[in-house]
Curated annotation (Swiss-Prot):
Pfam families to which the protein is assigned, alphabetical: TB2_DP1_HVA22 (PF03134)
InterPro entries: TB2_DP1_HVA22
Protein name as it appears in the record: HVA22-like protein k
Gene that this polypeptide is encoded by: HVA22K
Record-linked PANTHER family: HVA22-LIKE PROTEIN K, HVA22-LIKE PROTEINS
Family to which the UniProt record says this protein belongs: Belongs to the DP1 family.
Chain spans, region Disordered: 176-200
Top-rank taxon: Eukaryota
Length: 200
């Protein structure tokens, strides 16, 4: 294995025999729960590719950048299909095992599953329906612009509230730091108010 994949230890491990053996044991272990497999699917499907994409962008290697774009096109298509089918097929035994194996297959440098899916499924489909997809995307974008323009007041209000919340958090942070360091806390309005209440 050469090139970019060998520079990332986790990608190099995907093609090694040790990882294959451990992976198969995890995949077919009856003790593995869906929570473990969901976490593994998220790590393999998103976490590792995010880092690989970062490395491809930082290195400036156009071949690696194209490889990651193809991966994200394949993963995005899979996620789109999964949104509509997950509730039905997740009940099948070993669903998350198969999903995990599929996500590993998409990234294996030796087989380049994402490239196979892109070249054999995604690209031909999008080339055939490009005009309709462009119309749909333009329509959705136009509607989004209308919604944003018609709700400018609400958007400004939400932005102001977020800024106010973040501002109050930033103001409280130094006082909390003083308390944590054992510094004396200066008298606040609530202390003086409690004193005036005792006088009554």
């Amino acid at each position: 294995m050469s090139g970019f994949a060998s520079q990332i230890p986790s990608m190099a491990l995907l093609g090694s025999g040790l990882t294959g053996e451990v992976g198969l044991r995890v995949l077919f272990s009856p003790l593995s729960s869906n929570i473990v497999l969901r976490t593994a699917c998220c790590s393999i499907g998103i976490g590792l590719p995010v880092y690989s994409t970062f490395k491809a962008i930082e290195s400036g290697d156009e071949n690696e950048q194209q490889k990651m774009l193809i991966y994200w096109a394949a993963y995005g298509s899979f996620s789109l299909v999964e949104v509509f089918t997950d509730k039905i097929i997740s009940w099948f035994p070993l669903y998350y095992h198969v999903k995990f194996a599929f996500l590993v297959w998409l990234q294996l440098p030796t087989v380049e599953g994402s490239k196979q899916i892109y070249n054999n499924q995604i690209r031909p489909f999008l080339l055939r329906h490009q005009a309709r997809v462009d119309q749909l995307v333009d329509g959705v974008y136009g509607e989004m612009v209308k919604v944003v323009r018609s709700h400018q007041g609400e958007i400004r209000f939400v932005r102001a509230m977020i800024a106010k919340i973040l501002g109050s958090v930033n103001e409280d942070a130094p006082r909390l730091g003083e308390i944590a360091n054992g510094s004396p806390v200066s008298e606040t309005n609530s202390d003086s108010e409690s004193d005036s209440n005792h006088e009554d």
